[in-house]
């Protein structure tokens, strides 16, 4: 009899242990693997149990390379579960060569897996002139109402063709209003003048800037504001971008061009009255992300957006994992080596 009791006790303990393990692991990546997106399970770290969805959907700045690299950094060095979504062609290939917008006004782009935005704790987003079907756009609109953080890189401020059909209080909301600025032209020479980041001294203690030193990239400075649309009062500028005279890292500044805001924070409140933290960084080409400062700011922004500022360490690793040989930005695809590739190519 005692032996039977011991056996039942053992079975009960095992069942309880497994149930507890399942509970503790319930926050693990709840996104099914697919040949249309990438998934990275986080290791043990501050981000354990948090899910970051990253979107790569542009045609110029090689986000199909930089975004998976960021996902590896976040998952392997910081413990975040990550899902990477891409714009794909009719064959299911990542295809930066597709026109944006299409000449055929009936055609639409496709970003499979946007339903996973509903499971995201944070979104990192880089798209350019995506013309998506309304059911895919709805996933964005729902996220904009979620109160969760949004990190918008480079061309995200003109990320959708024709603007948003997102409304708040019966009013159409623009990306300018949501992100705090939108592309109004190339202040720096397009593909000719690199950018040197200059920390705004009044805001140098902001958590996103912890451990950030050198900031440089080959993408030019965007003009996102003018006299009619000045830098918003509800935004906090963190970095000014100084155009350089060429694309070399040690190039002197172009003194004929003033530095303009390239990184700022703000808050956004959607239709549910929930407040989101927003970080907009108008640098962000794949080559820019070779720079440690650019990577660290983006990683720090995830922590900041999630209210995890105390977990930001100035010496935490943002080292690139594996080979990272980003192609240059531009539209001369054959010369640059850009072509449609299977999703797994970017794993």
Which residues make up each language-model segment?
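Nucleotide donor/acceptor-binding cores
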Residues: 50
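Extracellular ligand-binding/catalytic regions of CAZymes and related secreted enzymes
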Residues: 25-47, 66, 76, 92, ...
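Active-site rim elements
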Residues: 57-60, 128, 191-197, 213, ...
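Helical hinge/lid and interdomain linker segments adjacent to catalytic or ligand-binding clefts
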Residues: 38, 53-55, 59-159
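Positively charged n-region of N-terminal signal peptides that target proteins for export
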Residues: 1-6
């Amino acid at each position: 009899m005692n032996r039977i009791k011991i056996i039942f006790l053992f079975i009960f303990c095992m069942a309880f242990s497994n149930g507890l393990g399942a509970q503790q692991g319930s926050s693990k990546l709840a996104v099914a693997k697919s040949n249309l997106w990438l998934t990275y399970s986080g290791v043990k770290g501050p981000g354990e149990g948090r899910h970051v969805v990253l979107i790569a959907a542009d045609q110029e700045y090689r986000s199909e390379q930089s975004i998976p690299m960021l996902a590896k950094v976040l998952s392997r060095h910081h413990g975040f579960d990550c899902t990477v979504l891409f714009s794909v062609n009719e064959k299911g290939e990542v295809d930066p060569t597709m026109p944006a917008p299409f000449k055929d006004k009936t055609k639409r782009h496709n970003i499979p897996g946007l339903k996973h935005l509903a499971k995201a704790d944070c979104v990192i987003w880089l798209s350019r002139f995506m013309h998506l079907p309304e059911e895919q756009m709805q996933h964005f609109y729902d996220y904009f109402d979620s109160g969760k953080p949004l990190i918008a890189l480079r061309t995200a401020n003109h990320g959708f063709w024709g603007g948003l059909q997102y409304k708040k209080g019966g009013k159409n909301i623009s990306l300018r209003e949501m992100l705090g600025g939108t592309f109004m032209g190339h202040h720096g020479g397009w593909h000719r003048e690199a950018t040197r980041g200059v920390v705004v001294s009044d805001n140098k203690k902001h958590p996103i800037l912890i451990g950030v030193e050198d900031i440089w990239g080959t993408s030019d400075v965007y003009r996102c504001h003018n006299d009619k649309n000045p830098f918003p009062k509800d935004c906090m500028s963190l970095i000014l971008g100084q155009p350089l005279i060429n694309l070399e890292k040690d190039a002197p500044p172009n003194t004929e061009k003033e530095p303009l805001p390239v990184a700022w924070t703000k808050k956004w409140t959607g239709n549910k009255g929930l407040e989101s933290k927003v970080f907009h960084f108008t640098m962000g080409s794949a080559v820019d992300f070779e720079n440690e400062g650019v990577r660290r700011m983006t990683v720090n922004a995830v922590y900041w957006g999630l209210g995890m500022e105390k977990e930001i360490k100035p010496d935490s690793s943002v080292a690139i994992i594996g080979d990272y040989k980003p192609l240059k930005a531009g539209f001369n695809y054959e010369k640059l080596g850009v072509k449609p590739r299977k999703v797994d190519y970017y794993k």
